[in-house]
Amino acid sequence: MEGPLSVFGDRSTGEAIRSQNVMAAASIANIVKSSLGPVGLDKMLVDDIGDVTITNDGATILKLLEVEHPAAKVLCELADLQDKEVGDGTTSVVIIAAELLKNADELVKQKIHPTSVISGYRLACKEAVRYISENLIINTDELGRDCLINAAKTSMSSKVIGINGDFFANLVVDAVLAIKYTDIRGQPRYPVNSINVLKAHGRSQMESMLINGYALNCVVGSQGMPKRIVNAKIACLDFSLQKTKMKLGVQVVITDPEKLDQIRQRESDITKERIQKILATGANVILTTGGIDDMCLKYFVEAGAMAVRRVLKRDLKRIAKASGATVLSTLANLEGEETFEASMLGQAEEVVQERICDDELILIKNTKARTSASVILRGANDFMCDEMERSLHDALCVVKRVLESKSVVPGGGAVEAALSIYLENYATSMGSREQLAIAEFARSLPVIPNTLAVNAAQDSTDLVAKLRAFHNEAQVNPERKNLKWIGLDLVNGKPRDNKQAGVFEPTIVKVKSLKFATEAAITILRIDDLIKLHPESKDDKHGGYEDAVHSGALDA
Protein backbone atom coordinates (compact mmCIF):
# COMPACT_ATOMS: atom_id res chain seq x y z
CA MET A 1 0.00 0.00 0.00
CA GLU A 2 1.41 3.39 -0.99
CA GLY A 3 1.58 6.32 1.40
CA PRO A 4 -0.38 9.50 0.65
CA LEU A 5 1.26 12.02 -1.69
CA SER A 6 2.09 15.16 0.26
CA VAL A 7 0.66 18.14 -1.59
CA PHE A 8 2.36 21.37 -0.63
CA GLY A 9 -0.87 23.31 -0.25
CA ASP A 10 -4.51 23.20 0.87
CA ARG A 11 -7.04 20.83 -0.61
CA SER A 12 -10.80 21.09 -0.29
CA THR A 13 -13.15 18.61 -1.95
CA GLY A 14 -16.77 17.65 -2.47
CA GLU A 15 -19.60 19.68 -1.02
CA ALA A 16 -17.35 22.19 0.74
CA ILE A 17 -15.75 23.46 -2.46
CA ARG A 18 -19.06 23.46 -4.35
CA SER A 19 -20.73 25.60 -1.68
CA GLN A 20 -17.71 27.88 -1.63
CA ASN A 21 -17.90 28.37 -5.42
CA VAL A 22 -21.65 29.06 -5.31
CA MET A 23 -21.12 31.62 -2.54
CA ALA A 24 -18.37 33.35 -4.52
CA ALA A 25 -20.61 33.53 -7.62
CA ALA A 26 -23.54 34.85 -5.55
CA SER A 27 -21.39 37.58 -4.00
CA ILE A 28 -20.25 38.74 -7.47
CA ALA A 29 -23.88 38.77 -8.68
CA ASN A 30 -24.97 40.75 -5.60
CA ILE A 31 -22.49 43.50 -6.47
CA VAL A 32 -24.03 44.12 -9.91
CA LYS A 33 -27.64 43.15 -9.05
CA SER A 34 -28.71 46.63 -7.98
CA SER A 35 -27.45 48.19 -11.23
CA LEU A 36 -29.86 46.20 -13.47
CA GLY A 37 -32.73 47.87 -15.28
CA PRO A 38 -33.96 51.36 -16.12
CA VAL A 39 -33.91 52.44 -12.48
CA GLY A 40 -30.70 50.63 -11.53
CA LEU A 41 -28.20 52.43 -9.30
CA ASP A 42 -24.59 53.35 -10.08
CA LYS A 43 -21.38 52.11 -8.47
CA MET A 44 -18.41 54.25 -7.51
CA LEU A 45 -15.13 52.38 -7.86
CA VAL A 46 -11.85 53.81 -6.55
CA ASP A 47 -8.61 52.10 -7.55
CA ASP A 48 -5.34 51.90 -5.60
CA ILE A 49 -4.04 55.22 -6.93
CA GLY A 50 -7.32 57.03 -6.23
CA ASP A 51 -8.83 57.17 -9.74
CA VAL A 52 -12.61 57.25 -9.51
CA THR A 53 -14.99 55.50 -11.94
CA ILE A 54 -18.75 55.96 -11.65
CA THR A 55 -20.70 53.45 -13.74
CA ASN A 56 -23.57 50.97 -13.84
CA ASP A 57 -22.18 48.94 -16.74
CA GLY A 58 -21.78 45.37 -15.47
CA ALA A 59 -18.67 44.59 -17.52
CA THR A 60 -16.87 47.75 -16.37
CA ILE A 61 -17.71 47.11 -12.69
CA LEU A 62 -16.40 43.55 -12.80
CA LYS A 63 -13.33 44.51 -14.83
CA LEU A 64 -12.29 47.02 -12.17
CA LEU A 65 -12.82 44.62 -9.25
CA GLU A 66 -9.76 42.79 -8.00
CA VAL A 67 -11.23 39.34 -7.56
CA GLU A 68 -9.22 36.63 -5.84
CA HIS A 69 -11.57 33.64 -5.84
CA PRO A 70 -11.09 31.49 -8.97
CA ALA A 71 -14.83 30.74 -9.40
CA ALA A 72 -15.67 34.43 -9.08
CA LYS A 73 -13.08 35.17 -11.78
CA VAL A 74 -15.07 32.92 -14.15
CA LEU A 75 -18.08 35.24 -13.76
CA CYS A 76 -15.95 38.36 -14.30
CA GLU A 77 -14.58 36.85 -17.52
CA LEU A 78 -18.14 35.89 -18.47
CA ALA A 79 -19.25 39.54 -18.31
CA ASP A 80 -16.21 40.56 -20.35
CA LEU A 81 -17.01 37.91 -22.98
CA GLN A 82 -20.64 39.09 -23.23
CA ASP A 83 -19.38 42.67 -23.63
CA LYS A 84 -16.99 41.70 -26.44
CA GLU A 85 -19.39 39.34 -28.24
CA VAL A 86 -22.63 41.31 -27.96
CA GLY A 87 -21.93 44.62 -26.22
CA ASP A 88 -24.97 44.57 -23.93
CA GLY A 89 -26.62 42.30 -21.34
CA THR A 90 -23.48 42.00 -19.20
CA THR A 91 -25.25 42.43 -15.85
CA SER A 92 -28.08 40.01 -16.57
CA VAL A 93 -25.73 37.24 -17.77
CA VAL A 94 -23.89 37.28 -14.42
CA ILE A 95 -27.14 37.31 -12.41
CA ILE A 96 -28.58 34.36 -14.38
CA ALA A 97 -25.33 32.35 -14.05
CA ALA A 98 -25.23 32.88 -10.26
CA GLU A 99 -28.90 31.90 -9.89
CA LEU A 100 -28.41 28.74 -11.99
CA LEU A 101 -25.49 27.78 -9.75
CA LYS A 102 -27.46 28.39 -6.56
CA ASN A 103 -30.33 26.17 -7.71
CA ALA A 104 -27.96 23.48 -9.01
CA ASP A 105 -26.28 23.41 -5.61
CA GLU A 106 -29.67 22.72 -3.98
CA LEU A 107 -30.11 19.69 -6.25
CA VAL A 108 -26.62 18.36 -5.54
CA LYS A 109 -27.31 18.64 -1.80
CA GLN A 110 -30.36 16.41 -2.39
CA LYS A 111 -27.96 13.71 -3.66
CA ILE A 112 -28.58 14.29 -7.39
CA HIS A 113 -25.36 13.78 -9.33
CA PRO A 114 -23.82 16.93 -10.89
CA THR A 115 -23.64 15.13 -14.27
CA SER A 116 -27.44 14.77 -14.33
CA VAL A 117 -27.83 18.44 -13.43
CA ILE A 118 -25.38 19.45 -16.17
CA SER A 119 -27.12 17.42 -18.89
CA GLY A 120 -30.49 18.83 -17.72
CA TYR A 121 -29.16 22.39 -17.90
CA ARG A 122 -27.76 21.80 -21.40
CA LEU A 123 -31.09 20.40 -22.57
CA ALA A 124 -33.01 23.29 -20.99
CA CYS A 125 -30.73 25.88 -22.62
CA LYS A 126 -31.12 24.25 -26.04
CA GLU A 127 -34.90 24.11 -25.63
CA ALA A 128 -35.04 27.74 -24.43
CA VAL A 129 -33.10 28.99 -27.47
CA ARG A 130 -35.40 27.02 -29.78
CA TYR A 131 -38.49 28.46 -28.08
CA ILE A 132 -37.18 32.04 -28.44
CA SER A 133 -36.47 31.60 -32.17
CA GLU A 134 -39.87 30.01 -32.86
CA ASN A 135 -42.22 32.07 -30.68
CA LEU A 136 -40.75 35.30 -29.31
CA ILE A 137 -38.94 36.85 -32.27
CA ILE A 138 -40.22 40.06 -33.86
CA ASN A 139 -38.90 40.70 -37.38
CA THR A 140 -37.46 44.20 -37.72
CA ASP A 141 -38.53 44.58 -41.36
CA GLU A 142 -42.15 45.12 -40.28
CA LEU A 143 -41.12 47.79 -37.74
CA GLY A 144 -38.51 49.78 -39.71
CA ARG A 145 -36.36 52.55 -38.25
CA ASP A 146 -38.57 52.91 -35.16
CA CYS A 147 -37.45 49.46 -34.08
CA LEU A 148 -33.76 50.51 -34.14
CA ILE A 149 -34.53 53.66 -32.15
CA ASN A 150 -36.54 51.71 -29.58
CA ALA A 151 -33.80 49.09 -29.19
CA ALA A 152 -31.23 51.87 -28.63
CA LYS A 153 -33.54 53.58 -26.11
CA THR A 154 -34.04 50.31 -24.22
CA SER A 155 -30.26 49.86 -23.99
CA MET A 156 -29.79 53.44 -22.75
CA SER A 157 -32.73 53.47 -20.34
CA SER A 158 -30.59 52.35 -17.40
CA LYS A 159 -27.71 54.69 -18.23
CA VAL A 160 -26.85 58.29 -17.53
CA ILE A 161 -28.04 59.33 -21.02
CA GLY A 162 -31.43 57.64 -20.55
CA ILE A 163 -33.07 61.00 -19.73
CA ASN A 164 -32.31 62.22 -23.25
CA GLY A 165 -33.00 58.81 -24.80
CA ASP A 166 -34.84 60.13 -27.89
CA PHE A 167 -31.99 62.47 -28.84
CA PHE A 168 -29.19 59.91 -28.34
CA ALA A 169 -31.14 57.02 -29.92
CA ASN A 170 -31.47 58.99 -33.18
CA LEU A 171 -27.80 59.99 -33.00
CA VAL A 172 -26.71 56.35 -32.49
CA VAL A 173 -28.91 54.98 -35.31
CA ASP A 174 -27.64 57.66 -37.73
CA ALA A 175 -24.04 56.90 -36.76
CA VAL A 176 -24.39 53.14 -37.31
CA LEU A 177 -26.22 53.57 -40.63
CA ALA A 178 -23.50 56.02 -41.77
CA ILE A 179 -20.74 53.38 -41.51
CA LYS A 180 -22.55 50.61 -43.40
CA TYR A 181 -20.51 48.73 -46.02
CA THR A 182 -20.96 45.44 -47.87
CA ASP A 183 -18.43 42.65 -47.42
CA ILE A 184 -17.18 40.15 -50.05
CA ARG A 185 -20.19 37.87 -49.55
CA GLY A 186 -22.60 40.75 -50.13
CA GLN A 187 -23.62 40.91 -46.45
CA PRO A 188 -24.07 44.38 -44.90
CA ARG A 189 -21.54 45.07 -42.14
CA TYR A 190 -21.47 47.80 -39.50
CA PRO A 191 -17.98 48.12 -37.95
CA VAL A 192 -18.68 50.05 -34.73
CA ASN A 193 -14.92 50.72 -34.39
CA SER A 194 -15.19 53.08 -37.38
CA ILE A 195 -17.13 55.49 -35.17
CA ASN A 196 -14.73 57.74 -33.31
CA VAL A 197 -16.08 59.00 -29.99
CA LEU A 198 -14.51 62.21 -28.69
CA LYS A 199 -15.28 63.65 -25.25
CA ALA A 200 -15.23 67.33 -24.31
CA HIS A 201 -16.50 68.34 -20.90
CA GLY A 202 -18.66 71.42 -20.62
CA ARG A 203 -22.11 72.37 -22.00
CA SER A 204 -25.09 70.02 -21.76
CA GLN A 205 -25.60 66.45 -23.00
CA MET A 206 -27.99 67.73 -25.66
CA GLU A 207 -25.14 69.62 -27.35
CA SER A 208 -23.43 66.34 -28.29
CA MET A 209 -23.24 65.97 -32.05
CA LEU A 210 -22.70 63.50 -34.87
CA ILE A 211 -20.17 64.48 -37.54
CA ASN A 212 -20.05 62.90 -40.96
CA GLY A 213 -16.38 62.03 -41.31
CA TYR A 214 -13.52 60.98 -39.06
CA ALA A 215 -12.69 63.61 -36.42
CA LEU A 216 -9.11 63.85 -35.17
CA ASN A 217 -8.33 65.59 -31.92
CA CYS A 218 -5.27 67.26 -33.50
CA VAL A 219 -4.37 70.47 -35.34
CA VAL A 220 -2.09 71.19 -38.32
CA GLY A 221 1.61 71.29 -37.56
CA SER A 222 2.16 74.90 -38.64
CA GLN A 223 0.01 78.01 -38.98
CA GLY A 224 1.33 78.51 -42.52
CA MET A 225 -0.33 75.33 -43.76
CA PRO A 226 -3.70 75.29 -45.55
CA LYS A 227 -6.68 74.55 -43.27
CA ARG A 228 -8.70 72.89 -46.04
CA ILE A 229 -7.66 70.49 -48.78
CA VAL A 230 -10.07 69.15 -51.41
CA ASN A 231 -9.39 65.76 -53.11
CA ALA A 232 -7.00 64.84 -50.34
CA LYS A 233 -4.34 62.19 -50.85
CA ILE A 234 -3.42 60.94 -47.40
CA ALA A 235 -0.08 59.44 -46.33
CA CYS A 236 -0.20 57.52 -43.01
CA LEU A 237 3.23 57.26 -41.38
CA ASP A 238 4.16 55.51 -38.16
CA PHE A 239 7.55 57.21 -37.66
CA SER A 240 8.92 60.67 -36.91
CA LEU A 241 9.91 63.15 -39.62
CA GLN A 242 12.83 64.75 -37.87
CA LYS A 243 16.44 65.50 -38.63
CA THR A 244 18.25 62.14 -38.72
CA LYS A 245 20.70 61.84 -35.87
CA MET A 246 23.37 59.19 -35.57
CA LYS A 247 22.69 56.54 -32.96
CA LEU A 248 24.32 56.77 -29.55
CA GLY A 249 27.66 55.01 -29.40
CA VAL A 250 28.53 55.69 -33.07
CA GLN A 251 31.95 57.29 -33.33
CA VAL A 252 33.13 59.14 -36.42
CA VAL A 253 36.75 60.24 -36.55
CA ILE A 254 37.22 63.32 -38.76
CA THR A 255 40.52 64.83 -39.80
CA ASP A 256 39.11 67.60 -42.01
CA PRO A 257 36.77 70.18 -40.29
CA GLU A 258 34.84 70.66 -43.56
CA LYS A 259 33.76 67.02 -43.39
CA LEU A 260 31.90 67.83 -40.16
CA ASP A 261 29.67 70.29 -42.05
CA GLN A 262 29.11 67.68 -44.75
CA ILE A 263 27.95 65.15 -42.12
CA ARG A 264 25.51 67.71 -40.68
CA GLN A 265 24.27 68.56 -44.16
CA ARG A 266 23.78 64.88 -44.97
CA GLU A 267 21.75 64.39 -41.77
CA SER A 268 19.39 67.14 -42.96
CA ASP A 269 19.30 65.84 -46.54
CA ILE A 270 18.22 62.30 -45.55
CA THR A 271 14.95 63.62 -44.07
CA LYS A 272 14.54 66.13 -46.91
CA GLU A 273 14.78 63.30 -49.48
CA ARG A 274 12.18 61.29 -47.56
CA ILE A 275 9.76 64.21 -47.58
CA GLN A 276 10.39 64.85 -51.29
CA LYS A 277 9.63 61.18 -52.06
CA ILE A 278 6.34 61.43 -50.15
CA LEU A 279 5.34 64.73 -51.79
CA ALA A 280 6.37 63.51 -55.28
CA THR A 281 3.54 60.93 -55.23
CA GLY A 282 0.99 63.75 -54.92
CA ALA A 283 0.42 63.41 -51.16
CA ASN A 284 -1.11 66.59 -49.74
CA VAL A 285 -2.13 65.38 -46.25
CA ILE A 286 0.53 63.73 -44.09
CA LEU A 287 -0.47 62.10 -40.80
CA THR A 288 2.25 60.79 -38.52
CA THR A 289 2.29 59.22 -35.05
CA GLY A 290 5.67 60.81 -34.31
CA GLY A 291 6.93 64.38 -34.32
CA ILE A 292 7.79 66.70 -37.22
CA ASP A 293 10.53 69.24 -36.55
CA ASP A 294 10.55 72.83 -37.84
CA MET A 295 12.91 72.10 -40.72
CA CYS A 296 10.57 69.40 -42.08
CA LEU A 297 7.47 71.56 -41.54
CA LYS A 298 9.07 74.19 -43.79
CA TYR A 299 9.10 71.75 -46.75
CA PHE A 300 5.42 70.89 -46.24
CA VAL A 301 4.44 74.57 -45.97
CA GLU A 302 6.30 75.33 -49.23
CA ALA A 303 4.52 72.43 -50.98
CA GLY A 304 1.11 73.61 -49.70
CA ALA A 305 0.51 70.29 -47.90
CA MET A 306 -1.16 69.70 -44.55
CA ALA A 307 0.96 67.83 -41.98
CA VAL A 308 -0.41 66.58 -38.65
CA ARG A 309 1.84 65.19 -35.94
CA ARG A 310 1.25 63.09 -32.81
CA VAL A 311 -1.80 61.28 -34.23
CA LEU A 312 -2.84 58.34 -32.06
CA LYS A 313 -1.88 54.99 -33.60
CA ARG A 314 -5.45 53.73 -33.14
CA ASP A 315 -6.80 56.70 -35.11
CA LEU A 316 -4.15 56.30 -37.82
CA LYS A 317 -5.11 52.65 -38.40
CA ARG A 318 -8.80 53.51 -38.64
CA ILE A 319 -8.15 56.37 -41.09
CA ALA A 320 -5.94 54.08 -43.19
CA LYS A 321 -8.73 51.47 -43.32
CA ALA A 322 -11.36 54.07 -44.21
CA SER A 323 -9.31 55.89 -46.87
CA GLY A 324 -7.52 52.86 -48.36
CA ALA A 325 -4.05 53.99 -47.27
CA THR A 326 -1.18 51.81 -46.03
CA VAL A 327 0.33 52.54 -42.61
CA LEU A 328 4.11 52.64 -43.05
CA SER A 329 6.56 52.21 -40.19
CA THR A 330 9.53 52.78 -42.52
CA LEU A 331 10.15 53.82 -46.13
CA ALA A 332 12.82 51.12 -46.65
CA ASN A 333 11.95 48.33 -49.09
CA LEU A 334 13.39 44.81 -49.23
CA GLU A 335 16.47 46.00 -51.14
CA GLY A 336 17.24 48.51 -48.40
CA GLU A 337 16.35 51.53 -50.55
CA GLU A 338 13.82 54.11 -49.46
CA THR A 339 10.74 54.32 -51.70
CA PHE A 340 7.21 55.67 -51.44
CA GLU A 341 4.56 54.81 -54.03
CA ALA A 342 1.27 56.48 -54.91
CA SER A 343 -0.60 53.20 -54.22
CA MET A 344 0.18 53.65 -50.52
CA LEU A 345 -1.88 56.84 -50.35
CA GLY A 346 -5.46 56.97 -49.11
CA GLN A 347 -8.10 59.22 -50.62
CA ALA A 348 -10.78 61.47 -49.18
CA GLU A 349 -12.99 64.14 -50.69
CA GLU A 350 -11.99 66.77 -48.16
CA VAL A 351 -9.74 67.26 -45.13
CA VAL A 352 -10.49 70.37 -43.14
CA GLN A 353 -9.59 71.90 -39.78
CA GLU A 354 -12.71 73.23 -38.06
CA ARG A 355 -13.57 74.70 -34.71
CA ILE A 356 -16.19 72.45 -33.15
CA CYS A 357 -17.45 73.05 -29.63
CA ASP A 358 -14.45 74.73 -28.00
CA ASP A 359 -11.67 72.86 -29.75
CA GLU A 360 -9.99 72.74 -33.13
CA LEU A 361 -10.47 69.37 -34.83
CA ILE A 362 -9.36 67.91 -38.14
CA LEU A 363 -12.20 66.29 -40.09
CA ILE A 364 -11.59 63.73 -42.81
CA LYS A 365 -14.76 63.66 -44.91
CA ASN A 366 -16.05 61.15 -47.49
CA THR A 367 -13.19 58.67 -47.37
CA LYS A 368 -12.83 56.41 -50.42
CA ALA A 369 -12.75 52.84 -49.06
CA ARG A 370 -15.35 53.09 -46.28
CA THR A 371 -17.48 55.77 -44.73
CA SER A 372 -16.78 56.88 -41.18
CA ALA A 373 -18.57 58.90 -38.53
CA SER A 374 -17.60 60.65 -35.31
CA VAL A 375 -19.56 61.53 -32.20
CA ILE A 376 -18.57 64.42 -29.96
CA LEU A 377 -19.97 64.01 -26.45
CA ARG A 378 -20.54 66.95 -24.11
CA GLY A 379 -21.14 66.54 -20.39
CA ALA A 380 -20.77 68.25 -17.04
CA ASN A 381 -17.48 66.60 -16.07
CA ASP A 382 -15.04 63.84 -17.02
CA PHE A 383 -16.83 61.14 -14.98
CA MET A 384 -20.04 61.89 -16.83
CA CYS A 385 -18.36 61.92 -20.25
CA ASP A 386 -16.69 58.55 -19.54
CA GLU A 387 -20.00 56.99 -18.50
CA MET A 388 -21.71 58.52 -21.56
CA GLU A 389 -19.08 56.91 -23.78
CA ARG A 390 -19.68 53.47 -22.19
CA SER A 391 -23.46 53.90 -22.59
CA LEU A 392 -23.04 54.96 -26.20
CA HIS A 393 -20.85 51.93 -26.93
CA ASP A 394 -23.57 49.59 -25.60
CA ALA A 395 -26.24 51.33 -27.68
CA LEU A 396 -24.08 51.24 -30.84
CA CYS A 397 -23.50 47.50 -30.38
CA VAL A 398 -27.23 46.90 -29.85
CA VAL A 399 -28.21 48.77 -33.04
CA LYS A 400 -25.49 46.90 -34.96
CA ARG A 401 -26.80 43.54 -33.70
CA VAL A 402 -30.40 44.41 -34.59
CA LEU A 403 -29.36 45.44 -38.11
CA GLU A 404 -27.28 42.29 -38.65
CA SER A 405 -29.70 39.74 -37.18
CA LYS A 406 -32.87 41.61 -38.31
CA SER A 407 -34.81 40.43 -35.25
CA VAL A 408 -35.66 41.63 -31.75
CA VAL A 409 -37.44 40.24 -28.68
CA PRO A 410 -39.58 42.12 -26.13
CA GLY A 411 -37.70 43.42 -23.08
CA GLY A 412 -38.74 44.05 -19.48
CA GLY A 413 -38.51 40.42 -18.34
CA ALA A 414 -40.97 39.13 -20.98
CA VAL A 415 -38.58 36.54 -22.46
CA GLU A 416 -37.49 35.18 -19.07
CA ALA A 417 -41.09 34.86 -17.83
CA ALA A 418 -42.20 33.09 -21.04
CA LEU A 419 -39.24 30.68 -20.91
CA SER A 420 -39.82 29.97 -17.23
CA ILE A 421 -43.44 28.88 -17.85
CA TYR A 422 -42.52 26.91 -20.99
CA LEU A 423 -39.62 25.04 -19.36
CA GLU A 424 -41.71 24.16 -16.28
CA ASN A 425 -44.26 22.48 -18.56
CA TYR A 426 -41.47 20.92 -20.63
CA ALA A 427 -39.86 19.47 -17.48
CA THR A 428 -43.05 17.63 -16.50
CA SER A 429 -43.11 15.95 -19.93
CA MET A 430 -39.62 14.51 -19.34
CA GLY A 431 -39.45 11.00 -17.91
CA SER A 432 -35.72 11.03 -17.17
CA ARG A 433 -33.77 12.31 -14.17
CA GLU A 434 -33.03 15.57 -16.04
CA GLN A 435 -36.59 16.63 -15.14
CA LEU A 436 -35.51 18.20 -11.83
CA ALA A 437 -32.60 20.08 -13.42
CA ILE A 438 -34.85 21.55 -16.13
CA ALA A 439 -37.38 22.59 -13.47
CA GLU A 440 -34.58 24.35 -11.52
CA PHE A 441 -33.41 26.06 -14.74
CA ALA A 442 -36.99 27.32 -15.21
CA ARG A 443 -37.05 28.51 -11.60
CA SER A 444 -33.81 30.46 -12.09
CA LEU A 445 -34.97 32.64 -15.00
CA PRO A 446 -37.55 34.84 -13.17
CA VAL A 447 -34.59 36.29 -11.23
CA ILE A 448 -34.36 38.94 -14.00
CA PRO A 449 -37.95 40.35 -13.75
CA ASN A 450 -37.67 39.92 -9.98
CA THR A 451 -34.47 42.02 -9.78
CA LEU A 452 -35.93 44.63 -12.17
CA ALA A 453 -38.95 45.03 -9.89
CA VAL A 454 -36.87 45.20 -6.68
CA ASN A 455 -34.60 47.88 -8.18
CA ALA A 456 -37.67 49.90 -9.19
CA ALA A 457 -38.94 49.84 -5.56
CA GLN A 458 -41.97 47.74 -6.59
CA ASP A 459 -43.50 44.66 -4.97
CA SER A 460 -41.53 42.01 -6.87
CA THR A 461 -43.54 38.99 -5.64
CA ASP A 462 -46.82 40.50 -6.79
CA LEU A 463 -45.49 41.80 -10.13
CA VAL A 464 -43.70 38.59 -11.12
CA ALA A 465 -46.74 36.50 -10.17
CA LYS A 466 -48.97 38.65 -12.43
CA LEU A 467 -46.40 38.47 -15.24
CA ARG A 468 -46.19 34.66 -15.00
CA ALA A 469 -49.99 34.40 -14.98
CA PHE A 470 -50.18 36.37 -18.26
CA HIS A 471 -47.54 34.19 -19.91
CA ASN A 472 -49.16 31.00 -18.69
CA GLU A 473 -52.46 32.16 -20.23
CA ALA A 474 -50.65 32.98 -23.51
CA GLN A 475 -49.16 29.49 -23.74
CA VAL A 476 -52.25 27.56 -22.62
CA ASN A 477 -54.89 29.50 -24.54
CA PRO A 478 -54.12 29.93 -28.30
CA GLU A 479 -56.75 32.70 -28.58
CA ARG A 480 -54.82 34.89 -26.12
CA LYS A 481 -51.46 34.32 -27.80
CA ASN A 482 -50.69 38.07 -27.86
CA LEU A 483 -50.17 38.05 -24.09
CA LYS A 484 -46.66 36.65 -24.76
CA TRP A 485 -45.44 40.23 -25.38
CA ILE A 486 -46.31 41.22 -21.80
CA GLY A 487 -43.35 42.55 -19.78
CA LEU A 488 -42.91 44.86 -16.82
CA ASP A 489 -43.60 48.59 -16.79
CA LEU A 490 -41.27 49.64 -14.00
CA VAL A 491 -42.35 53.27 -13.84
CA ASN A 492 -46.01 52.53 -13.14
CA GLY A 493 -45.38 49.17 -11.48
CA LYS A 494 -47.63 46.96 -13.59
CA PRO A 495 -47.36 44.51 -16.51
CA ARG A 496 -47.84 45.93 -20.04
CA ASP A 497 -47.52 44.96 -23.70
CA ASN A 498 -43.87 45.72 -24.39
CA LYS A 499 -44.24 45.21 -28.14
CA GLN A 500 -46.62 48.20 -28.29
CA ALA A 501 -44.54 50.14 -25.75
CA GLY A 502 -41.45 49.66 -27.95
CA VAL A 503 -39.21 47.96 -25.36
CA PHE A 504 -36.98 45.80 -27.56
CA GLU A 505 -33.70 43.96 -27.19
CA PRO A 506 -31.71 42.21 -29.94
CA THR A 507 -32.47 38.48 -30.06
CA ILE A 508 -28.75 37.69 -29.99
CA VAL A 509 -28.37 39.44 -26.59
CA LYS A 510 -30.90 37.08 -24.99
CA VAL A 511 -29.70 33.95 -26.79
CA LYS A 512 -26.01 34.56 -26.07
CA SER A 513 -26.61 35.51 -22.43
CA LEU A 514 -28.57 32.27 -21.87
CA LYS A 515 -25.87 30.19 -23.56
CA PHE A 516 -22.96 31.93 -21.81
CA ALA A 517 -24.65 31.82 -18.38
CA THR A 518 -25.42 28.10 -18.76
CA GLU A 519 -21.85 27.30 -19.86
CA ALA A 520 -20.37 29.31 -16.97
CA ALA A 521 -22.66 27.60 -14.45
CA ILE A 522 -21.73 24.18 -15.86
CA THR A 523 -18.00 25.03 -15.75
CA ILE A 524 -18.19 25.88 -12.04
CA LEU A 525 -20.57 23.00 -11.26
CA ARG A 526 -18.13 20.40 -12.61
CA ILE A 527 -15.50 21.41 -10.04
CA ASP A 528 -15.36 19.05 -7.05
CA ASP A 529 -11.78 19.54 -5.94
CA LEU A 530 -9.66 22.63 -5.26
CA ILE A 531 -5.95 22.34 -4.62
CA LYS A 532 -4.36 25.65 -3.71
CA LEU A 533 -0.58 25.51 -3.65
CA HIS A 534 1.28 27.55 -1.07
CA PRO A 535 3.64 30.16 -2.54
CA GLU A 536 7.20 28.97 -2.21
CA SER A 537 8.97 31.17 0.33
CA LYS A 538 12.45 32.40 -0.55
CA ASP A 539 13.90 31.12 2.74
CA ASP A 540 12.98 27.52 1.88
CA LYS A 541 15.89 25.68 0.39
CA HIS A 542 13.66 22.80 -0.70
CA GLY A 543 10.63 22.79 -2.96
CA GLY A 544 7.34 21.20 -1.95
CA TYR A 545 8.22 17.85 -3.54
CA GLU A 546 11.66 17.76 -1.88
CA ASP A 547 10.07 18.50 1.50
CA ALA A 548 7.77 15.56 0.99
CA VAL A 549 10.72 13.29 0.17
CA HIS A 550 12.70 14.39 3.24
CA SER A 551 9.71 14.04 5.54
CA GLY A 552 9.27 10.46 4.36
CA ALA A 553 5.73 11.07 3.11
CA LEU A 554 6.56 9.48 -0.24
CA ASP A 555 7.97 6.27 1.24
CA ALA A 556 5.95 3.15 0.60
UniProtKB/Swiss-Prot annotation:
Record localization: Cytoplasm, Cytosol; Cytoplasm, Cytoskeleton, Microtubule organizing center, Centrosome
Modified residues (Phosphoserine): S6, S551
Positions of Mg(2+) binding: D88
Chief place of localization: cytoplasm
Stretches for region Disordered: 536-556
Stated family: Belongs to the TCP-1 chaperonin family.
Residues where ATP binds: G37, G89, T90, T91
Name of the protein: T-complex protein 1 subunit alpha
Keyword Metal-binding: yes
GO molecular function: ATP binding; ATP hydrolysis activity; ATP-dependent protein folding chaperone; unfolded protein binding
Residues that coordinate or bind ADP: G37, G89, T90, T91, S92, S158, K159, G412, E505
Cellular component per GO, a single term: chaperonin-containing T-complex
Known function: Component of the chaperonin-containing T-complex (TRiC), a molecular chaperone complex that assists the folding of actin, tubulin and other proteins upon ATP hydrolysis. The TRiC complex mediates the folding of WRAP53/TCAB1, thereby regulating telomere maintenance. As part of the TRiC complex may play a role in the assembly of BBSome, a complex involved in ciliogenesis regulating transports vesicles to the cilia.
